[in-house]
Amino acid sequence: MQRGALSPVLMLSAAPEPPPRPPPALSPPGSGPGSGSRHGSARPGPTPEPSGSLGAALDSSLRAAVAFKAEGQRCYREKKFREAIGKYHRALLQLKAAQGARPSGLPAPAPGPTSSPGPARLSEEQRRLVESTEVECYDSLTACLLQSELVNYERVREYCLKVLEKQQGNFKATYRAGIAFYHLGDYARALRYLQEARSREPTDTNVLRYIQLTQLKMNRCSLQREDSGAGSQTRDVIG
């Protein structure tokens, strides 16, 4: 196996009947034609893909994901935010395909000792590429969403938390999560994320401004609760 190539650790099992072309170079040792005559009668059902097809599909999905991410970055620089969002979503779909989906049109193998053990496993290099691309896509999606005329703060919160699952020290995701929780009315969580962002960037004026806004909201809510409680007690006394 060539070093640095995007190829799966596990390959498909040997097909019961070899294709008319030579086997791929990355076939595992010992793979070859199965039982049955080359010129015998056709077996019912589709013929399994040759060994290496899953690796080609995986490689193709990863390349497509990186390409879509690059297109999204270009659209963002050109302030085409809706187009950028579409590109990032397509990149994420390709990453999902790379992390377990079988190639399009490939039937599930019949159970038995010769069936494939499952989707191709990612090598360490491939896993790092998937993770970094995924984080960049979600991080960029939040930036695009915050540029929208009507911001979907629930989606911003969701994507920020996905980034923080992989990179707990990501400043932008922490700060944007605080913004999302603030606009969703969850001021306690907003303050927690914003203070965490301030601990990483103590002089960031945007972070400091949102901390002040959040504290004002929390104080106002506290006063409203006190007034509501006092009013309830007054009504009880009068009644």
Swiss-Prot record:
Listed Pro residues bias regions: 16-31, 106-116
Entry keyword Phosphoprotein: yes
Keyword Repeat tagged: yes
Transmembrane segments: none
Region of interest: Disordered: 1-57, 99-126
Family to which the UniProt record says this protein belongs: Belongs to the TTC9 family.
Name of the protein in question: Tetratricopeptide repeat protein 9B
Underlying gene: TTC9B
